[in-house]
Amino acid sequence: MYDFPLTGAQKTFLRGLGQTLDASVKVGKGGLTPEFFTELQKHLNARELIKVRFVAADRDERAALAPQIADKGRCIWISSVGATALFFRQNPDPARRVIELT
């Protein structure tokens, strides 16, 4: 798993930023495919904070998929509401960071 500890205040800040985002990546009937993770990496590298929408998954499946995405996608699962989940990965290059956490 991506090991970057966030404080409660930082997670609250990121959830606030995430409210205005549209879902960047969608998980369909195919589940967590290599193509999904390629898209996930592309969007995380560009934006750092993304929303993932679960199209064909019930509540239990969504609860199981979100930690798997965080683990395999090397990112942090911030929160889930309904059929969407919010993920964050800070860019290792300080010059390319989109979101500054304090």
Language-model features: where?
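Positively charged, polar, low-complexity stretches
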Residues: 1-102
